[in-house]
Amino acid sequence: MIADGSEDEEKWLAAGAAAFKQNAFYMQRAIDSNNLKDALKYSAQMLSELRTSKLSPHKYYDLYMRAFDELRKLEIFFMEETRRGCSVIELYELVQHAGNILPRLYLLCTAGSVYIKTKEAPAKEILKDLVEMCRGIQHPLRGLFLRSYLAQISRDKLPDIGSEYEGDADTVIDAVEFVLLNFTEMNKLWVRMQHQGPAREKERREKERGELRDLVGKNLHVLSQLEGVDLDMYRDTVLPRVLEQIVNCRDEIAQYYLIDCIIQVFPDEYHLQTLDVLLGACPQLQASVDIMTVLSRLMERLSNYAALNAEVLPYFLQVEAFSKLNNAIGKVIEAQEDMPILSAVTLYSSLLKFTLHVHPDRLDYADQVLGSCVKQLSGKGKIDDTRATKELVSLLSAPLEKYNDVVTALKLTNYPLVVEYLDTETKRIMATVIVRSIMKNNTLITTAEKVEALFELIKGIINDLDEPQGLEVDEDDFQEEQNSVALLIHMLYNDDPEEMFKIVNVLKKHFLTGGPKRLKFTIPPLVVSTLKLIRRLPVEGDNPFGKEASVTATKIFQFLNQIIEALPNVPSPDLAFRLYLQCAEAADKCDEEPIAYEFFTQAYILYEEEISDSKAQVTALQLIIGTLQRMQVFGVENRDTLTHKATGYAAKLLKKPDQCRAVYACSHLFWLEDRETIQDGERVLLCLKRALKIANSAQQVANTARGSTGSVTLFIEILNKYLYFYEKGVPQITVESVESLIKLIKNEESMPSDPSAESFFATTLEFMEFQKQKEGAIGERYQAIKV
């Protein structure tokens, strides 16, 4: 038994090493004296120290390496003895007289190495004898190291193709047979280690077994290095024999390590040509074997092989690599009923990555993988294993990363079915990944059908999903997600107006049912996208769709009205107000007066009912005046109604300065230089006079409230409006009215005033002087004004 106490073990190792060193010394002295008899005597005593059962594998290895070094010296001595006339056959028989079996076999292997070198007997006969004789040691630890020594000293003496030991009687088949037999016996010893000692020490024994695995695996490495082991021999002899031993040993540690060894040490070409044999063994392994890692590594190796050697790609199709891997994974999962969901998902993730690398043009293969994954996930509900969820995201991201094109992923019918197994938070993450892929690669989604499929995938960020109790989305994250959706809208495009209208209708359906908090982010870009569509419509009489065209400006404006109506309820009345005015301008360009009037009406209703903040009212009124000034579609009646309303709003603003500025801004609604029908000088003058009256009232309020005359800035602003209309030739704006206003301002300026107003007035006077210097009508008009 191996001792528990590390201190005792150190003492035993020290004692063994001391005895070993002493006998090694006497052995070397005998070698130096060419005394074969004493050399054998002391070497046997030295090797007897390897008979101990008190050392752990780690400590035993220390002792073994000392023996290995001394045996190399002994082997050289044996070789010299044969040159001096000693018969190698007699030497081979002489070493077998050692009293204990373990030293005897070490010496026999050493003498056998010399025997093979002399070529006095076929190598295969000696190797067969040695590998059979080693059966005499059945203690797992001692037997493993003995056979490891045999493998080490024989590896350069195998009758391989091109080897000096190859001959008529010695072929690579003999070399393979020897290595396979030694491998089989070593694996049996290694597996038996698990049964040595009490059950409570099982964990320690498994750790120690892990430390010894390379002793067994080196045999497979030797096989992979033999020149004579070509594909045929590997397929017909090596692989079946190795797999038979792996399956029959029924030990999870051995099975996992050795299957992995096969994958790592033999060429990729061999794996490709023997896939069915290798994969056929996988379902026969113990259920506890980590077959997920093994198969993932196999697929990774094959993927890299295909990536580095384009000429081998036809062979993947020829051997039906994908089908074999897909079937094998299904059988493994079926055989291991308790396989964790993580392992199953990882297997399909690896298979999908393999498929995308090796068969990027076979979307049907990729879809099959996703379908198989769905089959395994069915009935399991949402995945709550964090690592499994992460692996599922990796699986779903693979097609996006490979093709850099979401459109290709949309062709995979099973893709959205896999997405359904993600939890709410992960759906949100996956949706963001998809949107970023579209933006990064500038991918255009060009049909309503594809947009529908896309939105099914990214509903994690466009719909209020059934979120777990207590799950709150960070506001910054939410805004970032919605901004990405807003950008996405501009990637949904088709030159055909009919198809584009179908696309925006799909967007409308999803956005209006996606929850109110998202609308302020998604409706504006949808409106912009729809307005772009209007600009692309053919002019009347040039419609390629004829009278029956399904997309008309009227239909689109009705559509816009429906989506903007949702905004005041969010509430986002300011946003809806702006969008109504934008739509009114678009209707103006389409010469749709009733529609434009309706949009203005909706904007006015929002102004009256929803916009109550004084600053917001000022901004809104500026937008109304600016938009109305640009409108050309309205007839006299409709325009009068709208301008009358606007001037009424201006006069009702809370603050006098705001009232004044809004009223004089309304003057522009009554004089448009390029439209003779809208040149009403009387109403222009009326607005300016009303503005002066309000400015005067504002100054009086300032005088009453603060004891000061207040700023004359408003008067100077009104003067600038007078000058503007005077320059435009409005008859009602006379020289006298301008001079009178200048005189008023000068009188006010005689009072204490603020420097900014003085500077403003001075700049205005300088402008007037500059205009006087101009030639023509402008100069003449300004020269008439006496300052």
UniProtKB/Swiss-Prot annotation:
InterPro entries: Vps35, Vps35_C
Recorded topology in the membrane: Peripheral membrane protein
Compartments it resides in: Cytoplasm; Endosome membrane; Prevacuolar compartment membrane; Golgi apparatus, trans-Golgi network membrane
N-acetylmethionine carried by residues: 1
UniProt keyword list: Acetylation, Cytoplasm, Endosome, Golgi apparatus, Membrane, Protein transport, Transport
ATP-binding among keywords: no
Disulfide bonds: none
Swiss-Prot/TrEMBL GO biological process terms: protein transport; retrograde transport, endosome to Golgi
GO cellular component: cytosol; endosome membrane; Golgi apparatus; mitochondrion; retromer, cargo-selective complex
Pfam families: Vps35 (PF03635)
Annotated family: Belongs to the VPS35 family.
Role: Plays a role in vesicular protein sorting. Component of the membrane-associated retromer complex which is essential in endosome-to-Golgi retrograde transport. Also involved in the efficient sorting of seed storage proteins. Binds alone to endosomal membranes and is required for recruitment of VPS26 and VPS29 to membrane. The VPS29-VPS26-VPS35 subcomplex may be involved in recycling of specific cargos from endosome to the plasma membrane.
SUBUNIT field: Component of the retromer complex which consists of VPS29 (MAG1), VPS26 (VPS26A or VPS26B), VPS35 (VPS35A or VPS35B or VPS35C), VPS5/17 (SNX1 or SNX2A or SNX2B). Component of a retromer subcomplex consisting of VPS29 (MAG1), VPS26 (VPS26A or VPS26B), VPS35 (VPS35A or VPS35B or VPS35C). Interacts with RABG3F.
UniProt name for this protein: Vacuolar protein sorting-associated protein 35A
Organism in which the protein naturally occurs: Arabidopsis thaliana (Mouse-ear cress)
Gene symbol of the encoding locus: VPS35A
